[in-house]
C-alpha cells in the first residue's frame, strides 16, 4: 500500500467547460484518457481531481486486475501506475499496457523512489518513473511533453 506523505494542491477548473450560445451547450474537447492505477483511495482521488482540472479524462482503478478490465474495450492515452499494488504488481501491468498500447505514455510511481526502481520501470516499458509524493507541476509537464498527438 502506498501512502502520500505530502498534500498535493488540487487544480481548479473543469475538464469540460460549458459556454451558452442561446440554447446550445458547447463542451471543450478532453485532452486524453489517463488510466490511474492507485490502491490508496485518497491518493487516487487527488490524482483524479488534478487530471480533471488539467482537462484529461481520468479512468481510476485500485488494482492491476481492475486496470486490465477497464481498458479491455477502451482507448487509453496515458497511464499513471503505482508499482506496488495488491495482487499483481504494477510493474507487470506496465509491461502488459506497453504491449497493448505502444503509443501511450506510461508513468510508474512509487514511494520507493530509488534509481534501481526507476531503471526497472523504464526497462519494462515505462516512459518515466516518479517518486512519491508526486509534484503536480512535474506530472503535468510529463503528460504534456511525452505525447503530442492527444492534446
Placement of each model-derived feature along the sequence:
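Acidic catalytic/metal-coordinating carboxylates
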Residues: 63, 89-92
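Acidic, metal-coordinating helix/loop segments flanking the phosphotransfer/catalytic sites
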Residues: 60-78
